[in-house]
Amino acid sequence: MAERRTYVEEVLAVLQYEFRPEQRATSERKLKRRLREKKLGPYDQAVIDAVRAFKYDVQAEIGYPVDSCFHTGSKGRFAAMDDWDVDGLRKHFRSRHPDVPGDEIDWFVPWAIYLYYLR
């Protein structure tokens, strides 16, 4: 049996594919339904907004690697996880987004590198 996701993990699972402001209403509907069906707690707009700000910040940092001080440069012909200072990114986002639990930041940063940079 798979581990049960936390509230913030479920929110990030929906928001990670929200790329345009027009998708916000769809994401909100999905979030309300998922949180209700999985009995993770009531919909909390303040938490959702904090996680959304974190997600957009991560996406912006990884989406423009040339401008990022955490992008260490390509070491080979292809993009790789080693092109990033993952620990530095984690520390940066932990200090910048204290409302988002540190454990959630720790797992999401490498996933975001895969999702927004490697794919």
Q: Language-model features: where?
A:
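Charged, amphipathic alpha-helical regulatory modules used
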Residues: 1-119
